[in-house]
Amino acid sequence: IDVSKGYPVIKPSRDGLQVKRQETMNVLSGALSKHQRKVPVPVAAIKPELTEADIGKIIVIRKKEHTLYLYDKEDLFNSYVIAVGMPQYPTPNGRFHVTYKEKNPTWLPTSEWAKDKRGIPQPPGPDNPLGGYWMDIGSGLGIHATPYEGTLGEDASHGCIRMASWAAEEVFNKVKVGTPVYIID
């Protein structure tokens, strides 16, 4: 999946190559004793783990636009206004995937910025900053609902992707664990 243009382009899958280690060691051993400078490297073809048929929903987050785009393969399903990380807690660029999902999550703040709430579980409810929907994307980051909908369209989070409750619910119900998430400028 290529998102360099800001939207997903699915590239055809193809076989890869894997070096045959033991055969390569044997070839190298023989080449060294004969002072050969060039040797063939024995390889085996391997099938791709993921093919075009395996791809479903794709999330692309464009931070400068404060927008999350939900695609069904290459077709845009919907777009949503979001909040991303503040300058001192930037949302990182990169390729992620949904590692788990939780409805009505408990928030357990572990970062220094949580101050007096650090280490104290915040149960589901109106005071929970994760809102009613959490989609973990690894590295302590997530896409989640927020009770602070006035911050949408701004750099306002501590690195996570904040969404309106209705939007987070829609995305939560459309994606599954393993859904790719691309965060770009």
Question: How should each PLM-predicted stretch be described?
Answer:
Residues 111-185:
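Exported/periplasmic cell-wall-interacting domains
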Residues 1-120, 124-127, 149, 175-177:
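Surface-exposed, secretory/extracytoplasmic low-complexity segments enriched in Ser/Thr/Asn/Gly/Pro
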